[in-house]
């Protein structure tokens, strides 16, 4: 919204495919005044990024790699995730078990799993990490953390089939806020960065060219599901 209609913007999707990502970058070098790039991986950087003038490049979201010479607006999938869970400690203590659902095919950084386990050990909570909901039922007394929206919906569907009430019989936390989470049941508790702020800062970089290096905090939106 902060960019006028005078700006020409090309939007490319790499679907987290490294070969496609590299091909897009290779064909884009020298064609644009600014490059706003979400990397294909959180820990591995493409050599083609080094071919872009660092003053023209902004890295978004993923960033667990050496990016000292680049502008970036990233999120922390480890310590910030732990800190967000700590904000919910009073609620999480009401559950006998915490379950993180992270699908095998998900591109979400796996360091979240490490900090999930660390939080549960530090707070003496039973925990489990699962990759599929196919043969899994939702049980009373458990709290679930789901990364993808499709998995949040599946957990809600399974709970309704079992006659369980979200926020009463079991807990549910989603990752990355969407408008839908405000209206599902009595609202889904969310851990998320401020995407609007990320967009505003990105527009500022495009407009001013002023270098920026910031890691946005993971915020908690507490709703009726926990």
Where are these regions (language model features)?
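Hydrophobic alpha-helical segments within soluble ligand-binding/sensing domains
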Residues: 63-99, 152, 191-211
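Short beta-strand/turn micro-motifs composed of small residues
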Residues: 37-39, 59-61, 74, 99-104, ...
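An alpha-beta-alpha
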Residues: 82-123, 214-226
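Flexible loop/turn connectors
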Residues: 91, 139-143, 150-226
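A generic secondary-structure signal
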Residues: 2, 27, 87-91, 118-119, ...
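Alpha-helical recognition/docking segments in bacterial nutrient-uptake
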Residues: 1-83, 143, 150
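Short, aromatic/basic amphipathic alpha-helical patches
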Residues: 25, 46-52, 111-121, 155-159
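Short beta-strand elements in bilobed, periplasmic/extracellular small-molecule ligand-binding domains
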Residues: 3-15, 98-101, 113-137, 142-143
